[in-house]
Each structure stands twice: as structure tokens, then as C-alpha cells.
């Protein structure tokens, strides 16, 4: 169970930041629904909802929006049109490797991310939409 907890902590570090920032993303309040699959887990993890308010500065530099964790570095980043792909490696207390892809569709996006940490693989799917201006 300890490994599963560490994996969950790693995931929490990168939501919502892991999937943001492409040319078509606008500032404002975004709502994300995340589903996760962990092979070998006895029960499916329920989807989680979160929201985040992104300023104009937040969405200006796509690479910087992937993570704010000082122990993580983006090792590969590509953006073409409305699609962003990346790879990231984290060290320190919660080491892991991530790869992801996000496709933006106006004021929404679909994202997939794969994380490898402590011998486990976690697949995540994120659906997000802009719900308005920041409060």
C-alpha cells in the first residue's frame, strides 16, 4: 500500500499543472475530471474533479506549466498546432518518469499521461473545460 500512496502523491503534484499550456489555451477557471488506472489495484480508483484558475502569465510559456516541482525536469517537449507532447523525469523523494499528450479543442482539452514510479505504471485520462473567468 505504501507504493500506491507514493504514486498517488506523485500524481497530485502534477495536477492540474501537468496538462496545461498550448497555444489555444485561454486564461480563466478550468475544471478537470481525471480518471486513473493502476494495473494490479484491486479496486478502480474513482474519477476526481478539480479546478484551477490560470492567469495570462500561467498560460504564456507552455513548457513551464507542465510542472512546478523543483525535483522534476521536462526532458522533451513538442508542440504542433493544438497538440502538445512531453516527457518529464522526477528525482528526490518521489522519483518517476512521465509522458503525456494533450489535444486542445477551443475551451476544452483531452489529455493522457503515463507515469512510471516505484515499479508501478499509472495511466491517466483528463478531460477539462474552461468554465469562466477567474474569481
Give the residues covered by each predicted segment.
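Compositionally biased, disordered extreme N-termini, encompassing classical targeting presequences
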Residues: 3, 19-22
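Bacterial N-terminal signal peptides
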Residues: 8-17
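Subset-of-secretome marker
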Residues: 22-135
Amino acid at each position: 500500500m505504501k507504493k500506491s500512496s507514493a504514486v498517488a502523491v506523485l500524481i497530485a503534484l502534477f495536477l492540474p499543472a501537468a496538462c496545461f499550456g498550448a497555444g489555444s489555451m485561454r486564461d480563466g477557471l478550468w475544471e478537470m475530471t481525471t480518471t486513473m488506472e493502476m494495473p494490479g489495484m484491486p479496486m478502480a480508483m474513482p474519477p476526481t474533479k478539480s479546478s484551477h484558475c490560470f492567469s495570462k502569465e500561467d498560460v504564456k510559456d507552455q513548457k513551464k506549466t507542465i510542472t512546478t516541482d523543483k525535483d522534476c525536469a521536462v526532458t522533451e517537449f513538442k508542440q504542433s498546432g493544438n497538440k502538445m507532447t512531453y516527457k518529464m523525469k522526477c528525482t528526490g523523494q518521489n522519483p518517476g518518469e512521465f509522458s503525456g499528450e494533450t489535444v486542445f479543442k477551443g475551451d476544452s482539452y483531452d489529455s493522457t499521461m503515463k507515469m512510471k514510479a516505484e515499479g508501478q505504471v499509472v495511466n491517466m485520462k483528463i478531460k477539462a473545460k474552461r468554465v469562466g473567468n477567474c474569481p
